[in-house]
Amino acid sequence: MPTAETLERFIARVEANAHAEAVEEFYTEDASMQENQSTPRIGRDAHVANERTVLSKVKTLTSQCIRPIFVSGDRVVVRWIFRFEWLNGTVTHMEELAYQLWEGERIAEETFFYDPAQRVPKKLDPQ
């Protein structure tokens, strides 16, 4: 079960948009990560590579944890809101729940639940 301090450090890393670093620091070596009902990705190195690939296409990113965080033993649920402004001038706004299984101070399994329609980038509104 993660300590409250560990959860706060994890959330702070994600909110600082250090997504790849958060995976390196807070996931087990053989962690699984799954998007809705898709096939899970396995392995911390694969997750880090995926995060870096996504972030290489981002102009700006806002990551926000919406509290409260739900903790029940080794199970944690975090509500996130992300806003991606892509290099191609489009924007993606996503809200998701991350359902996590922690082994001590690291995440061993994580499933993201969200409406897949949110992943479709939209043209940035001129202001």
Identify what each model region corresponds to.
Residues P2-T6, A20-D74:
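A solvent-exposed, acidic/Ser-Thr-rich amphipathic alpha-helical stretch
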Residues T111-Q127:
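Low-complexity, intrinsically disordered terminal/linker segments enriched in charged
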Residues T62-C65, R79, T92-A98:
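Short, surface-exposed coil-to-beta transition loops
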Residues Y27, F82-F84, A98, Y114:
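Short beta-strand segments enriched in hydrophobic/aromatic residues
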Residues G73-F82:
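A short hydrophobic beta-strand element
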Residues S56-T60, F84-V91:
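Short, cysteine-centered beta-strand-loop-beta hairpins and adjacent loop/turn segments enriched
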